[in-house]
Amino acid sequence: MDVLSYLVFFLVVAGIYAVATLGLNLQWGFTGIMNVGVVGFFGVGAYTAAYVTGPNYPDAFGGFGLHPLVGYLAAMVVSGAVAFVVGLPTIRLKHDFLAIGTFGIAICIQLVAMNWKSATRGFDGLHSLPKPFAAAAGSPFAANLAYLVMVVAIILLVTLALERMVRSPWGRMLRAVREDETASAALGKDAFRVRLQTFVMGSGLMGLSGALYANFTGFVSPQDLLPIFTFQVFVMLVVGGSGNNWGAILGAVVIWGLWTATETVLSALLPPGLQQQVAAVRIVMVGLILVAMLLLRPQGLLPERRNVSPEARLKP
């Protein structure tokens, strides 16, 4: 039962990462938007869900005590709204400058979470967040299993919706903007509008992943907003296959599996004097996996599929 409980826990966390990776895939994989502030929008979603669903805190804002599903919707809306405000002045920036700008936004969000204690309680965090199905399940294992089913259902709904979107004319326009923004603009396509749309929608999915995380763990604090989260999501997308939604999901499961496995293996192999270096060594190992993947299979485990319009397929 312990192994099964851990497997369910592992898959829930991998699913939460998969939702964030799908959001990044929409931005970077399909549109070429270099968003290095993934963890910032994840944090906005997590705190929004905590405010909407959490108990009344005497020393902080929030405590509406609404159903977690309401929290998930609110997290997507608020994260998307923040992305819209951020994207208006920054989305025109080129790759390097946009990466710096989004990274700076993520750092600002973390600093706000750390220092605005009347709203976030600082490092004390927002606690006692409700988990869906916990009361009806009867046991922690059953509650986690029900949560896993819900996360898988959300992933399938999001993936099917994204697949339908990227196969549409709008999806082909995303690829056109990604490949050559200037040529797309010359053909009458509003590249700024397209990039802003995908930035908002992708950030909304990142906010949803934060909400799922907050209600699963029952706690959120600035410690959950570390830049390593963004690194993990990028590695997941590169390994799984940029531009492929199913590849994004596969990459999330594979990299999270390697991330957790390396911690167990390194803890067993390293001598006691080096146990404090397990986290650093693990990051190095995952970085080496990323480099190897870029050298040996840059298209990822599941490469991007060619998308041809029906009209083009009918031409001789």
Residue ranges: model-predicted function:
Residues 1-316:
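Transmembrane alpha-helices and adjacent helix-loop boundaries
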